[in-house]
Amino acid sequence: MKKTAKTDTEDAFKFRSTFGEHYYDGYGARHETPHIVAYTGEVTAAGPGRVLISSPLGSCIAVCAYDPGTRVGGLAHVMLPGVPPAHAETGKDRYAAHALETLFSVMQNEGADPGNLLICLIGGANVLRREHDTIHIDNLRSLTSLILQRNLPICRTMTGGSERMMARMETKTGRIFQTTGNNPEEMLFDYFTHNIENPDN
């Protein structure tokens, strides 16, 4: 079993396993591949044969990173932009900057090359439809800036709107899927072929 990074850490990572025996995709099909769920403010990474899934995303954004050379994938469920407060002792991975540091570290622990990562972003919706609520925009701007500072490519995004989303990554195939609202799951990106199933989205 691989390890999943828990967010309420101090300096050292604490790990927990959240593997299930199966999961159901957006079409109701049953899959036997063990999966790991990243809840709000959590970061996870795993090698080939695992499926990484975000819990539902509102203004939060799922950072889906993948190293095609090692088939190691990682997912960070980011809640807030920027860096955590200086006095914060727990929940640091809720913040974009700290979550990315954790994501790249745990992926490297699984064998990934931090310089070889490809990124997709999913989420960042204004689900409450508040006119002056900008947290979803701030999250996207913060993550985009931090990722580009590392010279890592953002291959595909599915962000904005007002409906909740979910992200799912297959580490074996290098495919990432997204679900918006109650719609069926759709493939967003293939990390190996760079194919996009829905290029007009």
Swiss-Prot record:
It catalyses: L-glutaminyl-[protein] + H2O = L-glutamyl-[protein] + NH4(+). SUPFAM superfamilies: CNF1/YfiH-like putative cysteine hydrolases. The keyword Hydrolase applies. Pfam families: CheD. Gene3D superfamilies: 3.30.1330.200. InterPro entries: CheD-like_sf (IPR038592), Chemorcpt_Glu_NH3ase_CheD (IPR005659), Cytotoxic_necrot_fac-like_cat (IPR011324). One of its GO terms (biological process) is chemotaxis. Its EC number is 3.5.1.44. Keywords: Chemotaxis, Hydrolase. GO terms for molecular function: protein-glutamine glutaminase activity. Belongs to the CheD family. Probably deamidates glutamine residues to glutamate on methyl-accepting chemotaxis receptors (MCPs), playing an important role in chemotaxis. This is Probable chemoreceptor glutamine deamidase CheD. It comes from Chlorobium luteolum (strain DSM 273 / BCRC 81028 / 2530) (Pelodictyon luteolum). The gene is cheD.
